[in-house]
Amino acid sequence: MLRSTISLLMNSAAQKTMTNSNFVLNAPKITLTKVEQNICNLLNDYTDLYNQKYHNKPEPLTLRITGGWVRDKLLGQGSHDLDIAINVMSGEQFATGLNEYLQQHYAKYGAKPHNIHKIDKNPEKSKHLETATTKLFGVEVDFVNLRSEKYTELSRIPKVCFGTPEEDALRRDATLNALFYNIHKGEVEDFTKRGLQDLKDGVLRTPLPAKQTFLDDPLRVLRLIRFASRFNFTIDPEVMAEMGDPQINVAFNSKISRERVGVEMEKILVGPTPLLALQLIQRAHLENVIFFWHNDSSVVKFNEENCQDMDKINHVYNDNILNSHLKSFIELYPMFLEKLPILREKIGRSPGFQQNFILSAILSPMANLQIIGNPKKKINNLVSVTESIVKEGLKLSKNDAAVIAKTVDSICSYEEILAKFADRSQLKKSEIGIFLRNFNGEWETAHFASLSDAFLKIPKLETKKIELLFQNYNEFYSYIFDNNLNNCHELKPIVDGKQMAKLLQMKPGPWLGKINNEAIRWQFDNPTGTDQELITHLKAILPKYL
């Protein structure tokens, strides 16, 4: 659909010949919104004044909108990502002059000057040159000078200096992200000579040779994968082949901060087509570096020498277990979703749920494996390796890490509960309720991850076995809602702790927490029970907790 949209826009839009120093091409015309037109008019007026004042020395001030905005406008999509590249000064210098101009000409534009926020260099966050940010007509606009980059073998942080438009375009991750919009000419500029065609064809290609591009900054691999997933584009076969180069894996580990990996992966996992991205990750054999369990080499080394589960964890990584599991999940996921309209609906409503479910499903080979989270602690220092992958490897939130780890490490116990549920006589309502409370409201993630794990273990041709599996899980899911267990984590004892201690003629102490759990258990099996009936039950079992 997106590709046909591109063709339509690029073929039917008013076209004109655009000339650059080295080549001529036909470029589509971008239609600006009213606000965008106001911004461009202001920038044009200020640029004209500046060039008149300085007589175009050393060269005329020229402004270009860069990157994602140009791509998205050509795709017919709205974009609020407005980055302006400047050729003869820094972003801060330009923004300061523009603000002074606005103060003098407020009546003409009706736009208030805003404070300029300077974003300093921060290479670890991929900010290699300082950027100035301000608001124009209610839109945040970033100003930065055109730049060129030179990399070393040991770092993804380049030496950055002022550059030409060609140099700035060639340093970008993809040709279709290297398109510029010349504000003064109202034209799209394609200094890579391939960006417009690649955008029309839906192809992601690096402006420079792919291997060196990826070795310079391996994050570009993940960015291309994300763009392929977001727009349903293909990656050029030669570029795809270089993604799988073992050298890229090594560079990925040594050059990229886990925070940057996490930012890209979170965008992928909450996006519209995460499966395509996972397929590309699996084909490039990047799963081991993307889903690695820690970013601190000293912690990794300590675990290699002292962790009991390390051989099993390394087996998952080194013997292709994770890659094979990921491949199976990708192949069978469409069939899995087709059978579960409830899951499709839930994923459609909640991108966060989609992220946590997918991570739980693909990390299931790590179930119940632990690492030493803090080598300095002598006791209680074991952490689920799944939790570490999510929290330290992907740098997602503590809550997401806890939910995913609990889900993965409970897959076997969830399957055991389902096996008992198949024979209702073996399972009390309280046993189900107490089990579900362990997930603190996130039991549905565990439910579908457990079903996914069981589903992947059944050969595709054993259709009767598959149907029986889904039937059992669907019946269990319905049972939970029919018996009001879906929010069972919110259930509290009908007698509060203070009153309970008084009625049991006991002083509050450690016993009270255990008795509270027994009260909850009793309430699951006796939903219409009274306070007095509960106290009578608790008196009978109290001695074993003292």
UniProtKB/Swiss-Prot annotation:
User: What function does this protein fulfil?
Assistant: Nucleotidyltransferase that catalyzes the addition and repair of the essential 3'-terminal CCA sequence in tRNAs, which is necessary for the attachment of amino acids to the 3' terminus of tRNA molecules, using CTP and ATP as substrates. tRNA 3'-terminal CCA addition is required both for tRNA processing and repair. Also involved in tRNA surveillance by mediating tandem CCA addition to generate a CCACCA at the 3' terminus of unstable tRNAs. While stable tRNAs receive only 3'-terminal CCA, unstable tRNAs are marked with CCACCA and rapidly degraded.
EC number, UniProt record = 2.7.7.72
* Coiled coil residues, start to end: none
What does UniProt give as the signal peptide span?
none
Q: What InterPro entries would the database entry show?
A: NT_sf, PolA_pol_head_dom, PolyA_RNA-bd
Which reaction is the catalytic activity of this chain?
A: a tRNA precursor + 2 CTP + ATP = a tRNA with a 3' CCA end + 3 diphosphate
- One GO molecular function term? ATP:3'-cytidine-cytidine-tRNA adenylyltransferase activity
Q: Which Gene3D superfamilies match?
A: Beta Polymerase, domain 2 (3.30.460.10), cca-adding enzyme, domain 2 (1.10.3090.10)
The protein's gene is named CCA1
Q: What is this protein called?
A: CCA tRNA nucleotidyltransferase, mitochondrial
Look up the further comments and give them: Present with 13500 molecules/cell in log phase SD medium.
Question: Single Gene Ontology BP term?
Answer: tRNA 3'-terminal CCA addition
What's an example GO cellular component term for this entry?
nucleus
What family is this? Belongs to the tRNA nucleotidyltransferase/poly(A) polymerase family.
Q: Please indicate if the UniProt record lists Aminoacyl-tRNA synthetase as a keyword.
A: no
Which keywords does this chain's UniProt record carry? ATP-binding, Cytoplasm, Mitochondrion, Nucleotide-binding, Nucleotidyltransferase, Nucleus, RNA-binding, Transferase, Transit peptide
The kind of enzyme this is, by top-level EC class, is transferase
